[in-house]
C-alpha cells in the first residue's frame, strides 16, 4: 500500500493582503495534513505564492519598485501567516523561483511537442483583476466579469491550448471518477460548464513582461494560470521521477476556493492529460465567509485580519472556530459572538472543565500520579460505555476525514467530552474517596484515559493545546499517533502527571 499523501493549497496571489479566506484554506489543509501524519502517512504539504502577471507588474510600477523586489517583500506576508497560524507546510513554492521556471518551460514544451499548443490571434474580453478571459455571454448587463471585475477588449498575438479537444475526455473522467470534484454541488456546476462547450484557451500574453517567457519566443509571456497551476508539480521536482515528483504525484487532495474551481477542475486536468501526466485524485472546493452576514469586501471595509484574531483569542482557538463553525465545502458566516461562544461553551466548559476537574483531583488526591490499578481493572475500564465511545470516535474520525467532513470530527470530540463530564458527575469521585477508594481510582483512570483520546484526536486541529494536554497526562511524545489509541498503549499505572494548568481560558463577550 502506498503510504504517501500529497496535499496542496492554492498558491496565494502576492497582490492580496492575507485575510480570513487565506487563513481558512490554509488551516483546513493543515488539519488534513496533520491528521494524515497522525494516521501514519508520509505527508507532503505544499503552499506558496503566485507572483507573476499583469496585476503584479502594474502594482510594482505604481510603487516604483522592481517586480522581483516587490514580490520578495509581499510574499513574506503569506509566510508570516503560515507561521502565525501554525501551518505545518513541508514546502513553500514561489513562482519566481528558478526551480519553478525550469519546470514550467519543460511543461510548456511537452504540451507543444504533443500538439496541444498552437499560434494564433486572441481577441476578446479580459479581466486584469481575475487574470481571466470571459465570453461575451458571461458578462453582466454592466459589462463586468461575473466576479464584478472590470473587463477590457484585448487583441494580440497569442499561443492557444486546444482545450476544446479535451471536452469529451474531461466528461468521461468526471464520470469515471465521481470523487474528483468535491462537494457534489460544485461537481455538477463544473460538468454543466464543460457540457456547454469548451473553447481553446489563450495561454500567452504580449502586452506585459512580468512572467515566464515562452521557450524560444520571448515576445510572449506564459499565461499566469498555466504558470501558476504548474506549481503543484514544479515544487516536487517535475519531471524527475527520482525526485519527490515520482514519490508524491499524483496529489491526493488539492484544496481550492470555489472561485478558482474552474481553473483547477477544467484547465488543470486538461493540461495534465495533454502532457500525459496523471491527474490528482480530488479537487476540494470550499465556500466563502461572510462577516456578520455581510459579503466581505475591501470597499465595505469589513475584511477580517486573521493575525489580529490570533493576537486576541489565540491561534488554536481561531483554528478551532474556523473548522467547527461550517461544513467544509459550504459557505459560512463569521460572527464574533459565535467565536466567543464556541471557545467558552465547547473548549472551556466541556474539554477544559473535564481536564481541569480530573487532573486537579488526581493531583491533589492521588499524589499527582495516574491511579495504580491492575491490568484486569484497566481491561474492565475498556468495557465501559465511555471508553467504547472513545474507541468508536477514533475509528469514525478516520472515515469522516476520507470524506473531508472535518467539522463532524470535532462533533465527535465534543460529544466524547460531554459524555465524560456526565460520567464524572454521576460517579462523583469526591464521594467515592470516602466510600470506595478503589472504585475512585478506576473512575479517575477512565477519565484520564478518555482525556488521552480527546487530546490525541484534537492534535490536528489545536496542535499546541492538545500537546499541552498530552504533556499534562504524561503521554510519551512517541505515543501520540492514532495507532496508539488502544488498550495496548493505555496510560501507565502509577505514572506521573504534570501539575494542572489552564489550557482553554474563557473570554468575555
Swiss-Prot record:
Quaternary structure and interacting proteins, as annotated: Monomer.
What name does the UniProt record give this protein?
Methionine--tRNA ligase
EC number, as in UniProt:
6.1.1.10
Q: Which Pfam families match?
A: Anticodon_3, tRNA-synt_1g
Under the heading SUPFAM superfamilies, the entry gives:
Anticodon-binding domain of a subclass of class I aminoacyl-tRNA synthetases, Nucleotidylyl transferase
**Keyword ATP-binding among record annotations:** yes
GO MF annotations, alphabetized:
ATP binding; methionine-tRNA ligase activity
Question: Which top EC class applies here?
Answer: ligase
One GO cellular component term: cytoplasm
UniProt organism field: Rickettsia bellii (strain RML369-C)
Signal peptide (residue range): none
GO terms in the biological process aspect are: methionyl-tRNA aminoacylation
List localization entries.
Cytoplasm
Record's function text? Is required not only for elongation of protein synthesis but also for the initiation of all mRNA translation through initiator tRNA(fMet) aminoacylation.
Q: Which HAMAP family match?
A: Met_tRNA_synth_type2
Top-level taxon of the source organism:
Bacteria
Q: Kindly state which keywords UniProt assigns to this record, in alphabetical order.
A: Aminoacyl-tRNA synthetase, ATP-binding, Cytoplasm, Ligase, Nucleotide-binding, Protein biosynthesis
